[in-house]
Amino acid sequence: MACVSEAIGLALPYSAGTPAPYTQRDSYALKSGKAVMNLLAKNIRPRDIVTKKSLENAATIVAATGGSTNAALHLPALANEAGIKFDLMDVARIFKKTPYLADLKPGGKYVAKDMWLSLIHI
C-alpha cells in the first residue's frame, strides 16, 4: 500500500517505501514538508492531484506487486471522496489485465524493503 501514495501523486518518489529505520526517511520528511508548503502556497489541493488516471496507476502498482486487496476498497473510497468515478469494477478490470511482476509478501517471497532497495539502485 505504500506504493499507492506515490502512484496517485501524494508522496514524493521513493519516499513511501523507504524502510522505517533508514536515515533517508528524515530527508524525505523534510522534502515532503517543503513540497506540501509549496503546494499550499499555490493553492493546490489533493483533489487537484488525484485523478482517475492516478487511481488507475495505483491499482496497477498494487496488482503488479501482489499488494493488498484492501486497495480494491480503499481506492474507490478515495475516488468517491474526490468526486471521481472509479469503482470496484474498475479495480477488478485493472487487476485482471495486470501481470504479476514482484513476488512480495504477505503471500510472496520478498518484502517491500527488497523492492525499495532495487529501485534506488537503478
Regions found by a protein language model. Name each.
Residues 120-122:
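Conserved small/polar residues in nucleotide/adenosyl-binding loops
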